[in-house]
Amino acid sequence: MMQGNTCHRMSFHPGRGCPRGRGGHGARPSAPSFRPQNLRLLHPQQPPVQYQYEPPSAPSTTFSNSPAPNFLPPRPDFVPFPPPMPPSAQGPLPPCPIRPPFPNHQMRHPFPVPPCFPPMPPPMPCPNNPPVPGAPPGQGTFPFMMPPPSMPHPPPPPVMPQQVNYQYPPGYSHHNFPPPSFNSFQNNPSSFLPSANNSSSPHFRHLPPYPLPKAPSERRSPERLKHYDDHRHRDHSHGRGERHRSLDRRERGRSPDRRRQDSRYRSDYDRGRTPSRHRSYERSRERERERHRHRDNRRSPSLERSYKKEYKRSGRSYGLSVVPEPAGCTPELPGEIIKNTDSWAPPLEIVNHRSPSREKKRARWEEEKDRWSDNQSSGKDKNYTSIKEKEPEETMPDKNEEEEEELLKPVWIRCTHSENYYSSDPMDQVGDSTVVGTSRLRDLYDKFEEELGSRQEKAKAARPPWEPPKTKLDEDLESSSESECESDEDSTCSSSSDSEVFDVIAEIKRKKAHPDRLHDELWYNDPGQMNDGPLCKCSAKARRTGIRHSIYPGEEAIKPCRPMTNNAGRLFHYRITVSPPTNFLTDRPTVIEYDDHEYIFEGFSMFAHAPLTNIPLCKVIRFNIDYTIHFIEEMMPENFCVKGLELFSLFLFRDILELYDWNLKGPLFEDSPPCCPRFHFMPRFVRFLPDGGKEVLSMHQILLYLLRCSKALVPEEEIANMLQWEELEWQKYAEECKGMIVTNPGTKPSSVRIDQLDREQFNPDVITFPIIVHFGIRPAQLSYAGDPQYQKLWKSYVKLRHLLANSPKVKQTDKQKLAQREEALQKIRQKNTMRREVTVELSSQGFWKTGIRSDVCQHAMMLPVLTHHIRYHQCLMHLDKLIGYTFQDRCLLQLAMTHPSHHLNFGMNPDHARNSLSNCGIRQPKYGDRKVHHMHMRKKGINTLINIMSRLGQDDPTPSRINHNERLEFLGDAVVEFLTSVHLYYLFPSLEEGGLATYRTAIVQNQHLAMLAKKLELDRFMLYAHGPDLCRESDLRHAMANCFEALIGAVYLEGSLEEAKQLFGRLLFNDPDLREVWLNYPLHPLQLQEPNTDRQLIETSPVLQKLTEFEEAIGVIFTHVRLLARAFTLRTVGFNHLTLGHNQRMEFLGDSIMQLVATEYLFIHFPDHHEGHLTLLRSSLVNNRTQAKVAEELGMQEYAITNDKTKRPVALRTKTLADLLESFIAALYIDKDLEYVHTFMNVCFFPRLKEFILNQDWNDPKSQLQQCCLTLRTEGKEPDIPLYKTLQTVGPSHARTYTVAVYFKGERIGCGKGPSIQQAEMGAAMDALEKYNFPQMAHQKRFIERKYRQELKEMRWEREHQEREPDETEDIKK
């Protein structure tokens, strides 16, 4: 029996996700607690005080002298809690040590809070272990274990009398337990410290009857309180009925050696429980109902009451361990679910185990429903009002984040009894395991594999084979596998480039003709196939590489685990949770009853062969909702073996869900020697313990449950009897089956969810099986969404609607045409053959129960996404080695590798996932806003352009929600150009601007960057769509060049400019000498002449003396002032020894510097702008007009150095002023550094962005006029565009004036003049926009006016104030 009880303690192993004790018999240190390395400590925790507890020799009185009014006096055979303890010195050592003694034990970091364990159970009465004197005769075993002792035995602490129903063991602090279903175990650190008020014992303390009010930071938000209240009301009547089961049901999941009269498992009355019909029970229920709203401050410390209500606290409708929804999301409360349903009914039990008192409980449910509605209407407003008044700060996002972090903290867990299926004897262990399977477990595995594991294969083998007819695509694939795809420009790596090769209709008909198909409207999965054809149409060469083919660089085969052990030393355990909980909380979760407790499915445990360190959270969009998949390192449940996990995985993922294309080994290792899957999964059926821990159901109990449930849905021999059942009895059975997954081995698909079960007999002469009704979803390829006619009509409808919205006058005929198209679309949607929702009716003959419900399948479909995410980030660590830089922000590296065509759908064959979700997932998932897919991704259309470009910049750096690498490519392009320009400028001091530009073009062109990307093997790490987008080599090389620029931008963004320079230099030159020359360039020639400073020359140079005035004006003192002089030297000036040349080379460098600084600013402060939008903003910021305006405001024209001897003021052209500013930027960078340039542009350039955005200066007049004209196009005709004609040319050749007119639809709408044709066209377009009433232009003005009314007022006031200042100055002078 002691061996059986060893499953209730966790042992720790260093460096792994499971605990494992080391050491010999006798006194050993306290069990080390586990804390994952990648979790931060939320609150400072004090280490627990180690103590040795010697239980008293005689049992103490469990009840106080004055019994509690809510309970009956204790019965003579009542089992006290805690059970009496024998003295440690009297009893012999147990035959099996508490933890197996392993050498070289290493202590691990503790949990944030060490778990509290009840005391050691007394030894079993057996011939070798006599009963303890003084113990009551009915005393049995208790399933808890105490941590091993660590010090010599001190005198036992005296037991202090308390006025409570039960006495707590010293291992528990006497505190009120939090609701275990929503909060992780988190004690106050002071609860583990010696109490100052307790002089009798230094190891425990007594708290006041009610705890002090919580701090504001620890209170729950009103939404969470409502969540608790609604959930508690909903399942209020379930906690009591679970105890009143028939005897055979209570004994069902238990080993025979534990079913004895003297064990702890006895009837309800033997436990001292109040009878169900006693009036004190009703009184206690009323008190609990009034008190439960304030249960954080008042909760009975009775442990028995906690056990009685633990199932209600956890919630029957919670089938997954979930975290709260993030800030900004509306949580889906159980109370809201109750209010929205027509008929309220509690969750039903599964597998046809019905309580004999269901009729009485139904009356109580109805009564509870009425009381709930009364309480809700009377007390909700007042209660929530008071809460919100007291705690307004709880609505802040940081509070929600704190609650989420607390929920994600690991909790201590334990396993249920091993029941002789596992042995934890250290002499039986193999390798680094802590548990090894016994012969009894081996027999269970053989039975499971025989009855369930091979059932599908046997059924398929019994059916006649079917060879589908070959199509043109099959023949083409066979030919392409023989002749490999060449890498020239015209070659293709996909056979889908020719549309005539593949006939979708023929492929769909072929799948419909399968003889084993279960129903015409149920779609099934075939390996490597989608619903409309093969998944991969790539050539044999292309299939050997790429993440899209599930080939992750750096992966190696894993040595197989030992099947009959838990391999605790080499596996890392993680608990998987999903947030928000929408669509993962079901009203009929999968529940397993064992040992008079109900274990609810909460998700999956994942066992990895390597620690998942430095891997970000997995985010995925499903049901139009952004989900986050968390994997939290936790203590490992010990009672499992790897073979049991694999048997369950094959049963669920292969036989039930039919995920044939989900490969956890990798295609490269399929033909290699046997290797282990990279992850093992274990379903978590848990019950919450009163002290914040969890009890996880052992794996063998799950397999036994599946074997028990494996029986016919409607047995043939009982069908006549079932048809004679009363209507109520049949409804009970049908309700139990609703949401259950049933399987018909050998069919396609094999498994389906039951939504209704009908027994109507249409032919009185023939008895037919009941009908299974399943509500499914037709694949998009076969519904109206995939119909070519519907798509064409939809496009024409949207186009016409847009034209009418922008038309100045809408004709009645156009309105009728739009209504006709809308009606035609509606008719197509309502066709039975085109509707997405279908109703499937199947005969229940041949269907078998599986024991699982849709919640298990719902969570199982998240696992392929998570495994793909983890494997991809593990292979990115291999990329870190290739580039020589380790990213701290792993999401940034993933973003750099993500092509715009990539979409993370399901982590595997998308049609397989959709089919399995439709067949076995929840019936009616709740969908979010469909805009979530393109909310931050859409960039087409004039309205989208105006909407995005009207957004002002963020004050603080904000992360972008655009999840591809185009923005990083925009930044990386500027970084590459800057690095190239700087190095060329310094390495070739005598080369003019034209030569420098030629060299730079050769380095930064895409063809060369693709070669550098090939050195890093970026094509093996890139994420892009598995389709024809990048099949051609030219397209792939272009994408690789963009990916390389994005990678450089990511290195610059996270690392520094120096890191980007080193990476670029390593890739440019393989030769170390050339690389050294490139990286260590010389100083500027003016700096080489005067290494320290040249300001001593100011005294003898009038030119330099004048430049000191400019230095004082801008507040920057140059170390080498001759650099500033060269920046202001125009190219008309000949060579001189002061400047050693003119400013044309500096202009080349300054342009690249300004591009980089402006690009970085826009990238950081405009997170919602795509690459094209950022380019428009940068063009409005870094252009000749803006640069000339800044140069003029700074007075640079006064300091320009020319060859004019008269020293008369000369009006410089716009281009010349812009060149002066760019040269000054280069001089500032050479003399100082890039930080000075950032500051200069922060002051002189970036504040102008607001004005540019409000005035829409980012859009030049010609582009704006063309956009307005295109909105007025007529359907079915070529769009009219504005035409420009030169009317007149006046003046000499060096000073001509051009007159240009613009025409639209044959009508002149504007005219303009300018010194060049381009400027004259701009003037004509501006004149047309002002005179012609374009609806689009009016819409843009109204949009900006409504959005920024206050900003526009302030801007106009500032402009008027600036215009009045010169006039006031002139008046003062007069």
UniProtKB/Swiss-Prot annotation:
Main location per the UniProt record? nucleus
- The reaction(s) this protein catalyses: Endonucleolytic cleavage to 5'-phosphomonoester
Comp. bias (Low complexity): 182-202
Report the protein name in the record.
Ribonuclease 3
Q: Which residues bind Zn(2+) 2?
A: 561, 609, 676, 680
The record's EC number reads 3.1.26.3
| Lineage of the organism | Eukaryota, Metazoa, Chordata, Craniata, Vertebrata
Q: Which gene encodes it?
A: DROSHA
Q: What SUPFAM superfamilies does its record include? A: dsRNA-binding domain-like, RNase III domain-like
Protein family according to the UniProt entry: Belongs to the ribonuclease III family.
Organism of this sequence: Homo sapiens
